[in-house]
From Swiss-Prot:
It comes from Porphyra purpurea (Red seaweed). The keyword Chloroplast applies. InterPro entries: Ycf54 (IPR019616), Ycf54-like_sf (IPR038409). Its main location: plastid. This is Uncharacterized protein ycf54. The keyword Amino-acid biosynthesis does not apply. Belongs to the ycf54 family. One of its GO terms (cellular component) is chloroplast. Disulfide bonds: none annotated.
Length: 108
């Protein structure tokens, strides 16, 4: 099982009101310059919110939620400090998230 950490908010807030693109660009540049593999993903309408243990989060962001998921708890805590109005939490899952499993293509 892998522990995934997440920051959760409404899609409108994260995609329209916050400089999320800038945050991700800076983070990706940092990872690339340090030869680290990307360990975070932006997931609209995350299915993990349907788990019974996640009901409190689903109630906080009931419609059109979006999650930033990572295996790095420090990054998620940093996002909470950087962005502010997000819920943070964690869950365990046997799913292995990767560029391949999410069909992510690097654009050059």
């Amino acid at each position: 099982m892998t522990t995934y950490y997440f920051a959760l908010a409404s899609q409108n807030f994260l995609l329209s009101e916050e400089p999320l693109e800038e945050v991700f660009r800076e983070r990706i540049n940092y990872y690339q310059s340090n030869n680290k593999e990307i360990d975070f993903w932006l997931i609209p309408n995350p299915k993990f919110l349907n788990k019974p243990a996640m009901i409190k989060f689903k109630n906080l962001v009931p419609n059109e939620a979006i999650a930033i998921i990572s295996t790095n708890s420090i990054f998620i805590n940093w996002l909470k400090l950087r962005i502010g109005y997000v819920c943070i939490g964690q869950f365990e899952d046997s799913l292995k998230l990767s560029k391949e499993s999410l069909n992510i293509i690097n654009r050059t």
